[in-house]
Amino acid sequence: MNVAVVMGGYSDESVISLRSGQLILNNLDKSKYNIFEVHILLKDWSVVIEGEKYPINKADFSFTKNGVITKFDVAINTVHGTPGEDGHLQSYWELIDIPYTGCNFYQSALTFNKRDTLSVLTKFNIPKAKSIYLRKGDVIDGNEIKKALGLPFFVKPNQSGSSLGVSKVDALDQLEKALEFAFAEDNEILIESYLNGTEVSVGVLNYKGQTKVLGITEILSQNDFFDYEAKYLGKSEEITPARISKEEEILVAESAKKIYNSLGMSGFSRTDFIIMNGIPHFIEINTNPGLSPQSIFPQQAMFAKMDMPQMLDNEITLALSRKPIWKK
């Protein structure tokens, strides 16, 4: 079976994705699969073999080496941000009938859009921060935002990952800079009220037909919040299992599973919460969580005594069992 381990992306998250892809390459069972490293970058789609690059034929996601055309039986998607986490790659693979891991194009697009995710979860009574949605060019009144949300508050790109473009605003004179920072990542932003509590992250996946919670990790950032530096440059402490009460642990696990199932997820995911007054408040869900050695999801898999090669086998089995929507 030819397996494409797809990594990279078009955003600043591509560096993290390349690290995630390496973990997958190192943990796939080479006795079961013919494994290929595939880079999808803005100006370069290619297969990398012993340092040499072979261009991907986008018509059918194949490549040619020494006159021999190789096609893939399944794609393992580790692309963070666009186009691998927002539904674009998933739609492409659906159209050319390539099975792929993770959730489908609709769930990917939905969960990459913070506003739309929050709107859907409102139906399921999931506690969350208050928020204001704005687009570039809208009239923005800092005093009205303060009145609605209080201080401090967070300014976030509506569609971005790895906390890129996120700022905490403690005073209104910081708002203009925060808006510029967020709008540099996206033309839409969310402004959210501050939740004062314990931040936790929860790995969830579909494993052998069951929705399974891997573990709950407590996040202690050296910065004001769990930003890019804290996530990837060692500016945080991540404690698994989280130092929370048994009641809180149960509530967080139940909420994470409810969100996963309510949104129709499949594959690996990571859901972030702030526990405030004993109640977990939803922050966001990541449908292509980081898999670098520094990332939370692999740490939680180790805590749960889950074998990464077996987890990847499970992902491939799920991908092969799912038919494209147009074939149903």
Swiss-Prot record:
**Residues reported in the UniProt entry to bind Mg(2+) 1:** 272, 284
GO BP annotations, alphabetical order: cell wall organization; peptidoglycan biosynthetic process; regulation of cell shape
Cofactor(s) of this protein = Mg(2+); Mn(2+)
Under Gene Ontology molecular function, one entry of this record is: ATP binding
Q: Name one GO cellular component term.
A: cytoplasm
State which pathway it belongs to: Cell wall biogenesis; peptidoglycan biosynthesis
- What subcellular locations does the record give? Cytoplasm
Q: Which UniProt keywords apply?
A: ATP-binding, Cell shape, Cell wall biogenesis/degradation, Cytoplasm, Ligase, Magnesium, Manganese, Metal-binding, Nucleotide-binding, Peptidoglycan synthesis
Kindly state which reaction or reactions the protein catalyses: 2 D-alanine + ATP = D-alanyl-D-alanine + ADP + phosphate + H(+)
Q: Which residues bind ATP?
A: 146-201
User: Per its UniProt record, what Pfam families does this chain match?
Assistant: Dala_Dala_lig_C, Dala_Dala_lig_N
Q: Under which main EC class is this enzyme filed?
A: ligase
Q: Which residues form the ATP-grasp domain?
A: 118-317
Q: How is the cofactor bound?
A: Binds 2 magnesium or manganese ions per subunit.
Q: What is its EC number?
A: 6.3.2.4
Residue positions annotated to bind Mg(2+) 2 are 284, 286
Its primary localisation, in coarse terms, equals cytoplasm
Which family is it part of?
Answer: Belongs to the D-alanine--D-alanine ligase family.
Q: What does this chain do?
A: Cell wall formation.
Spell out the NCBIfam families in the cross-references: D_ala_D_alaTIGR, PRK01372.1, PRK01966.1-3
Its protein name is D-alanine--D-alanine ligase
Q: Which organism is it from?
A: Flavobacterium psychrophilum (strain ATCC 49511 / DSM 21280 / CIP 103535 / JIP02/86)
